[in-house]
Amino acid sequence: MWLFHGYMPEFNQKGEKMSGKQLKISEKKRFPVFTFLFFFILLCVAGFMFYMAFKEQVPYWISDFKSKQVQNEYTSFGEEADGTLPYDFADKKNEKKNTKEKPAKTKNIPQDWNGVDWNGLKKMNPDIIGWIRIPDTAVNYAILKGTSDNYYLYHHMDGSYNILGSIFAEKGTSLQLDDAHTILYGHNMASGQMFGQLSNYTDTDFWKNHSYVYIYMPDRTMTFAIYDVYNCLDNDETYTIGFTLGSNDFEKWIKKTLKKGYYSTEFKPAGDEQIITLST
């Protein structure tokens, strides 16, 4: 590396001519200094790159830690069982207080009724209106609704700032999530957090093993079958809302979405059935 070579004078500081031996000794004394400098700079560059990579990952680690902390503190979902219908809040209210009878087992539905500490969640953040969960995936988060559609793009479910944001509904969405068409948004994170695993649904095997989405509300549990998977632009008619259940417009919209899917599924919704869209 010529940048690390210095000019070797022919005479020493006393004005005496230096012999070949002296020159050789001088070179040996100076070379380690430049070697040290080279490795020092290299170490600094490597350290800086490591620091930047570490700094970039910190928000992801913090978000993951805080999300799991909320999940562990405020939710407790049981194992899935066999059957077809969810154990709803209405069934819970109709049970006798001291009965030891368990609800009928259901297929792909959490065995416990709700498993969410709504009082605790509401105290943590009043903007929480529900909870979304796809078993055996990273999708296990509170659903939020803020006064602005942009707020929870960059705020955690506890209300603190975080670049990963949260799962949220548009500000015009019903607080009961009972609109004909509800859209829930979440970032498409390469880490798999938030809605980062939705891209896995391009694989039919993944869909077969994760074909239900569960929405938990303070008064009920809703089960949605995933009937369509596709990519679209943000101005696509997929994002149309404001439908009325059972209306012709809603039925036409459903038929159009069925034509967009990457593959056909066994589920075909009717115009009187509520639809949710998970969007990144």
Where do the language-model regions lie?
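Solvent-exposed, non-transmembrane regions of membrane-associated and secreted proteins
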Residues: 42-280
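General helical structural elements
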Residues: 6, 34, 70-73
